[in-house]
Amino acid sequence: MGKDIKDEILSLRDAIKKWDREYYVDSSPTVGDVTYDKALLRLQYLENRYPEYKTLDSPTLKFGSDLLNDFKEVEHSYPILSLDKAYDVKELLLWVEKMSLEGSNLGFDMGISAEPKIDGCSIVLYYKDGILEKALTRGDGRFGNNVIENVRTIKNVPLCIGERVELVLRGEIYITKKDFLKINHTLDDSYINARNLTSGILRRINSREVVNFPLDIFVYDILYSSLELNTNHDAFDKLKHFGFKLNPFCKFFCGKNLGENIINYVKEIEEQRERFEYEIDGVVLKVDDFRLRDVLGYTSHHPKWSIAYKFESLRAVSKVIDIVVQVGRSGKITPVANIEKVLIAGAFITSASLHNQDYIDSIGLNVKDVVAISRRGDVIPAVELVVEKLSVGNFKIPNYCPSCKKSLIKEGAHLFCVNIHCPLKIMGHIKYFCSKKCMNIVGLSEKTIEFLFNMNFISSEIDLYTFDFDRLIGLKGFNFKRVNKLKRSIEESKNRPFKKLLLAMGIKDLGINTILLLINNNLNSFDAISLLCQDNKNALVKLLDIKGIGERIAFNIIRAFNDKIILDKFNFFKGLGFKMQEDSINCVVDSSFLFGKKFCITGSFDEYPRHVLIDKITKKGAIFNSSVSRYLDFLLVGKSPGLKLKKANNLGIKILSLFDIKNLVNLDD
């Protein structure tokens, strides 16, 4: 009996996977909807009755689940970088010529892959032994949220690829223009564009709801593969074989007239832009040969072997209804134009930043004027010019703060409120503190913070940890369940890493990259930084010794750690048990041979996957470089090394094996 049930389940599963491929990949279905639905319902019934036979690659997972997702934050195995950008064809042509020259000098025949840049939500798919193991959002490039339960519901995401291989893939999840307009019309809270709607659907906590939305995906890049793949177009052939959906407008270019042919392709895609059923905002070019990519390497921001050509922003005409003045957490004053609602590139626009008084004067703008509106980079609304002047004179920003009424000061082209008690500045600090990039207090939206602040329930970040949130129960929008969720989120925030707390303090010029520089130079705790800053002169010398920290940043760090208000906040959080030091796993070890050494890797290793080995070495204080340059301290060489070894030898860089490294330092402690 058991064997018969298991055999039927396996047979149904194989049949449904075959039909899925015929329908979604080959576009040639061999069975009708009734047959398909009947088989899927039978499989679902059997798996529910015999759960011991259910597997992670079952097609029934496409139905979703009623279990609530918690979207845990997970570290990416590889940094998820941005792309270099070009905004005109001359810039793009220069990049193509540069890649061709570098490829030729290294003995490569240049080939370039091109494809439309989808304006959706980036996702990273991890396959282990051929089965989808996790699906991470891009997040901050280092950490993303695992939304696998929701991604499993997307029909064009294979749950199993039929071979026991490991893959890490990048893709773009999207919703078509037609579906966006149809769905958005039915929602209580509508979305500004298709990308935001896609993101909202992807983050729904109940995957049974997600299955009802027509999300789709294009896979466009391989970050890691256990297969031997040498080129992008070979990789795409393999991905198509596995059942992944690839953009049909992808094209490969090589040979004579390379630059001219690519520019013609880009212009053709841009001309057809409005005919695409989904939003696109440019074209992405990638060097086709993976070995050449390996040599070209990366910056901290983007791969050198790829570039995105951004289309010129679409424009529309609207009328300025009003101009309001906003105050940021730094006190910066920003004028904003409220305009009559207009649709641009799939998004409804109702406001646009005017930057400063100089910008307003340069375009001669005032209330009632008719203006041309764009979305720069298809993201940021901008007033480009006055089409019809219906007012007299230009709008003038008041010389006092709209929040606290104190006089403003001018720094460069911008006006600032320097009153530390300014309500809007304080509220901006609280919003920043709670934001996802900082303490990530789920449930404390900007609207909720504004309500709590305006009701005098909170007046600083500290109040979030002293206020009795039970007082909110019974108020409009605050039931017992929501209040408990808020309390739980606030409590969980106490466990954030020290670097997040340091970022959340909003210290001028102290962004995450500077914080990581401090941590990697033994300034990895509140006590270490505050102790150093007690001696201003010594602190300045020490900070300026850190590559990447200049005088302005150093002075702002010293000033902040001598500010009583900031120190009192740190001490308050310390008293609540917040982490005031980076966990040892993230901190460098000063005594290690590897501390401060810049290294690169080529070849493969039996003992560790490359990304694991890189992680182990960087935790000893070394700095990983993705490409070989004269600044490298050593190249770690494994089996079947690539062209990096030749380049390192030419530059006289020290060559080490894994055996050499392990003789010098214990990687596993």
Curated annotation (Swiss-Prot):
Descriptive protein name: DNA ligase
Keyword Electron transport carried by entry: no
Residues that hold Zn(2+) according to the record: 401, 404, 417, 422
Recorded GO MF terms: DNA ligase (NAD+) activity; metal ion binding
A Pfam family per the record: DNA_ligase_aden
Family: Belongs to the NAD-dependent DNA ligase family. LigA subfamily.
Domain BRCT: 589-669
Enzyme class of the recorded protein, top EC level: ligase
